[in-house]
Amino acid sequence: HQGFALGVFGAGNVGASVTKFVGPPLIAGTTVGATYLGIFPGGWRFIPVLYAVLLVIMGAMTWFMSPHADRMPGAAQPLSQQLAPLKQIRVWRFSLYYVAFFGAYVALAAWLPTYYMDNFDISLQSAAYLTAIYIFPASLLRPYGGYLSDRFGARRIMYWSLGGMLVITAVLMMPNGHIVIDHADGSQTDHLGYAIGLTPFVILVFLLGCAMGVGKAAVFKHIPEYFPDNVGAVGGLVGMLGGLGGFFLPPLFAYTKAWSGFPSSTFFVLFLLSVVCLLWMHGTVVRMLHTESPGLARHIEQPPVAR
């Protein structure tokens, strides 16, 4: 049940959704310059102070309620030995997968409110609520993704998740527009008009969040299977690079939008990222099949008539 356990742990990402739901009403419901209970300032400053109080409460709960004797399986290993797996290309491949699932999730969660307001002309509060519809499944489905990885295998779930992201982003990246045909008499007619409405967009982004939530669990299911003695070092690197992906993707979104002029180019970036991950993973699977089971590989690649 490693996949399920890691998925439950990772479902803490749902805190981003809670912030999207709770933050705007709290900011709007407090008065800038006022003070509540002597410690809570009004306006946007209310949020970080409330967060600091919650951190203190969580720290106290951790201190008093968690076991004080930590399990440290790598305590006897020197640091160089613990970091040795980082020389393997597999670790960096897992990291790229996590950039596609977690880094893209973080980047899109930050990008979507502005996208909604600019392209669908809705308020900030409505944009935050619609963004939460994407964030909730991307977080809460992580335990289910772990369960599916335990049952069907992490690699199969990766194929499903990346394939789903590929199809969804291919639809979302199509720009709104139409073909204009000029006629000999000087008139013009529009043909093949395409424009995605708010409801279809929200549904597709919701499905994209589902694929990301399941995929995040599948990536971390790989780590204890391939690196049982270095889960901390490998998991830390994979998580770090996934977080860095969430930092670098928004500027890339902005650059592609400025270069192309299409707001939907955001999803073109995610489409390319999904393609790279899917091709790298499939190429690795094919190479492993030829190396470890050459007879089976030849049988699969033979045409039916030759078998």
For each feature predicted by the language model, list its residue ranges.
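Residue-level signature of mid-helix packing/kink "hotspots" within the transmembrane helices
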Residues: 17-18, 135-143, 246-247
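Juxtamembrane intracellular "pre-TM" segments in multi-pass secondary transporters
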Residues: 67-95, 301-306
